[in-house]
Design a protein with these regions (language model features):
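Short alpha-helices
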Residues: 90, 168-218, 225, 411, ...
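A short beta-strand element within the Helicase C-terminal
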Residues: 364, 665-672
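Long, low-complexity, charged/polar intrinsically disordered regions in eukaryotic proteins
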Residues: 671-709
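Structural motif
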Residues: 135, 340-343, 621-627, 643-646, ...
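Short, ordered loop/turn segments at secondary-structure junctions
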Residues: 79-80, 108-111, 137-138, 160-163, ...
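Active-site cavity-forming subdomains of large catalytic enzyme subunits
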Residues: 123-198, 207, 224
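Acidic, two-metal ion nucleic-acid-processing modules in DNA metabolism proteins
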Residues: 91, 228-270, 274-322, 358, ...
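Hydrophobic helix-and-loop "lid/oligomerization" segment in the mid-to-C-terminal part
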Residues: 3, 7-131, 151-152, 169, ...
């Protein structure tokens, strides 16, 4: 299921002399005046704010200059992610440029020490350093800062994370969230760059802005205001970087010119992160700061190998976690995916949680059990504050008279980490299912995936000029996304699968005389749908193939115009119906008398629409798309044929179910065609014992008429068999024409022949072979017997 949402309200007023379309795109990004537009579209280094407007900067600069002048021992205490690595590298180079002789980086082990300052490290570092300077951490380490002060250290805390109620009692504290600094969303390396700006001016900034750009993209902070300057200027300088390590890493990651945010976020950042995830991040600092070509090559090559190892490990954990979902998650009742695995790498489970959260659009907690404890990483969706929910779980558990739920936990609205006793993981699931639906700001419709678009454009406007216009918004990323556009009412001239295993969707889209190609990555299954007109969400892009440059639509989503559904092709539905009838016929006589009395409740169409409001838990069994369209009447649901492929139990119209693959995931199962198929409700009850079973009491008899038409006379079937004996083309359409039958009747007859061994017949893909002739009774076919028993009375035999 998918909803389209429009971002903001379009204005009819321009910003200065800018085109109306660009004016609206800028307004959606918080840009409202010509002056703001100039800064946004043409960011310059001179747009960086005065670093001394950040509270604590003057004191920090004074301490650093004294430490360098008096040659104190200095430790830069960082973090093991890309932001912490780059922030550490920036400060290390800055202090060395100032003349510091006794400065060292220290990055804690993710696996042995965890994030932030820790007492053991403080005790060690206090023996050799007089100044402790944190980057990308420390703002919540009140006890550890107090310990460092007690051990005689001078402490400067620089961080960008959320402020606690009380700040650490350091000698200087720098955080852009502290008022009155004008831009709040710098990353840790961005704060380090501001210190460099204060100490060395713009010359120092220009030498290190490449590292700040990499960290800004990797740490997913908004690409607005100062961050926009940092990323744009930093990427420009990467092309001529004097850093041997960065150059070698770019070479191994196949980063070509010009560098873009995708290169930073998806190619360079994972390789740097791999160091901290699997080994130590200090080697990454060495990579970014070394001037030795051989050392740079060795470290970059090693990190590239670690990243490949990390990818394999992540893939394995994701696959194992997804395979555990059926046993550990019930989408009918659960409000979070909570997966417990054994001995997974703690440095990779966060990536796995992110992948699963993105795939299922569900709050996700992936836990790895080590002995009696489980370490977990959480990722969430907009609308569910996972940190708030964990806090509520902790409070509820204590209110119930228990002890501590968590050994430790922390984070923010969309990501968190926790440690819990493994035996309490079932309790965590239970508590989440209580607190999430009761959350103050939780609208349960947030579980329905949404795609947001900014502007609606006609297909004729999707051209090179539009791409050039949108490119003015670069660099794009978090907070400044690549604009998503919508084109309505397009005709699908062609939809086919491409790529390995047909994973991707290749489209030809028309609007009058206007034709554009489209590509939908990981959407190959949409090629099998029946299309009328569609509304498409997309980003325009240039496709280069054999020297030709054309505009194509990078398709993010597609829905039927005027509704939320993409309806299956009628031939697909009939093929599945025939398989369903075959299964029903084979099982019909084995149903017990108790099963044959499975309780089913009447339901009217308007009552069904009320049940669909929550978006989850209703499975609608259908066999004819025209009636299903009437029932839904513009409502929201998924559609599938044979089996439901989405595990999340969104409201779904399932055509002709493969009963063996039906799962007990549903709150309600509704037979849209009424009780037309004897035995169907009984088999559904066996597969879905926890669901309430309904049938529409106002359903038409169209399905019964179709089934009656399929129940042809024995003379007609004999005529079909004689036609097979004559040979010639065996296509169903030709057989139908020669025998005066419909294709549906032919396919039904061939299925009957297959059951009595007159032919070898496969419906999908179509394969037909005559077998040696022998005497048979057609009623020995379970399908034939089922059709005659229930529908022959309405057929003129």
């Amino acid at each position: 299921m998918l909803r389209y949402t429009k971002k903001g309200i379009e204005s009819k007023e321009r910003i200065g002399t800018l085109p109306l379309r660009m004016s609206n795109l800028l307004r959606y990004r918080g840009v409202n005046t010509p002056e703001e537009a100039e800064c946004f579209l043409h960011p310059r280094l001179t747009d960086l704010l005065d670093p001394f407007t950040m509270p604590g900067m003057e004191k920090a600069v004074s301490i650093i200059r004294q430490a360098v002048r008096e040659q104190w021992g200095i430790t830069i205490y960082g973090d093991y992610d890309v932001d912490g690595i780059c922030a550490t590298s920036i400060m290390l180079e800055t202090l060395r440029d100032l003349g510091a002789q006794h400065v060292r980086p220290y990055i804690p082990s993710r696996h042995e020490e965890g994030y932030g300052l820790n007492a053991d490290a403080i005790e060690l570092l206090a023996k050799e350093s007089r100044l402790l300077l944190t980057v990308d951490c420390g703002i919540t380490n009140l006890d550890e800062v107090a310990l460092a002060k007690k051990r005689g250290m001078t402490v400067i805390v620089t961080d960008h994370h959320q402020l606690a109620e009380k700040l650490p009692e350091a000698d200087a504290v720098l955080n852009p969230l502290i008022e009155p600094y004008a831009f709040k969303r710098l990353c840790g390396a961005g704060v380090a760059l501001k210190i460099t700006q204060a100490l060395l001016g713009m010359d120092g900034v220009e030498k290190r802005i490449d590292l700040a750009a990499l960290a800004t993209v990797a740490d997913i902070v908004p690409l607005m205001e100062e961050n926009r300057v940092i990323v744009r200027e930093g990427m420009m300088r990467m092309g001529t970087s004097a850093r041997p390590g960065l150059k070698k890493l770019m070479e191994l990651a196949q980063v070509s010119q010009p560098v873009n945010t995708g290169h930073l976020g998806f190619r360079l950042a994972p390789r740097l992160n791999a160091g901290g995830r699997l080994e130590t991040a200090e080697q990454c600092v060495k990579l970014l700061t070394t001037k030795d070509e051989a050392e740079a090559t060795a470290i970059a090559t090693h990190l590239n190998g670690l990243n490949q190892e990390r990818q394999a490990m992540e893939k394995q954990i994701v696959e194992q976690a997804i395979s555990a979902i059926p046993a550990q998650v019930n989408f009918r009742t659960d409000f979070a995916i909570v997966i417990l695995g054994q001995e997974w790498n703690n440095g990779v489970i966060g990536l796995a949680a992110g992948r699963i959260c993105e795939k299922y659009h569900f709050p996700t907690i992936v836990l790895s059990q080590h002995g009696d404890l489980a370490v977990g990483s959480c990722r969430s969706i907009p609308g569910v504050d996972i940190h708030q929910m964990l806090t509520a779980c902790k409070a509820l558990y204590q209110a119930e008279g228990h002890g501590q739920l968590f050994e430790r936990f922390g984070g923010h609205s969309q990501a968190a980490g926790l440690t819990i006793r493994a035996e309490l993981v079932p309790e965590l699931r239970r508590l989440l299912n209580r607190v999430i639906p009761q959350g103050d700001n939780c609208d349960l419709t947030c579980y329905i995936p949404q795609k947001e678009y900014e502007l609606e454009v006609p297909l004729e406007a999707v051209n090179m000029a539009l791409i050039d216009e949108l490119n003015q918004l670069q660099p794009t990323g978090y907070g400044n996304p690549n604009p998503m556009l919508m084109a309505r009412g397009l005709h699908v001239q062609e939809a086919r699968r491409v790529g390995v295993g047909g994973a991707h969707l290749k489209l030809t889209l028309l609007d009058g005389a206007n034709v554009r190609g489209g590509i939908g990555f990981q959407q190959g299954d949409l090629a099998d749908r029946g299309y009328e007109r569609v509304d498409v969400l997309f980003s325009p892009e240039v496709n280069e193939f054999r020297g030709q440059r054309t505009v194509q639509l990078n398709v993010a989503a597609m829905k039927q115009t005027g509704g939320s559904l993409l309806w299956p092709d009628e031939k697909m539905i009939f093929s599945a119906l025939l398989q369903e009838l075959t299964a029903l016929a084979s099982n019909y006589n084995t149903l017990s008398s108790a099963d044959a009395q499975a309780k089913i409740l009447p339901l009217r169409t308007n009552q069904l629409r009320e049940k669909l409001r929550l978006g989850r838990g209703v499975l609608m069994i259908a066999h004819q798309s025209a009636w299903a369209k009437d029932v839904l009447s513009g409502g929201e649901a998924d559609t599938d044929v044979g089996q439901v492929r989405d595990a999340r139990a969104f409201n779904t119209v399932l055509f002709a179910p493969d009963l063996e693959k039906l799962r007990d995931d549903w709150r309600d199962v509704v037979l849209l065609d009424g009780e037309t198929l004897p035995g169907l409700k009984d088999l559904i009850r066996q597969k879905c014992p926890n669901a309430r079973l309904w049938c529409l009491s106002d359903a038409p008899d169209d399905l019964r008429k179709q089934l009656s038409a399929m129940t042809v006379s024995e003379d007609t079937l004999r005529g079909l068999y004689r036609r097979l004996l004559r040979g010639g083309t065996m296509a169903a359409s030709a057989l139908a024409q020669d025998c005066g039958m419909t294709e549906e009747q032919v396919l039904t007859g061939l299925t009957v022949f297959g059951q009595v061994a007159l032919v070898s017949f496969k419906l999908d893909p179509y394969q037909l072979t005559l077998l040696p002739m022998h005497k048979v009774a057609l009623t020995d076919s379970p399908l034939r017997k089922y059709l005659i028993t229930h529908y022959a009375a309405e057929t003129q035999m």
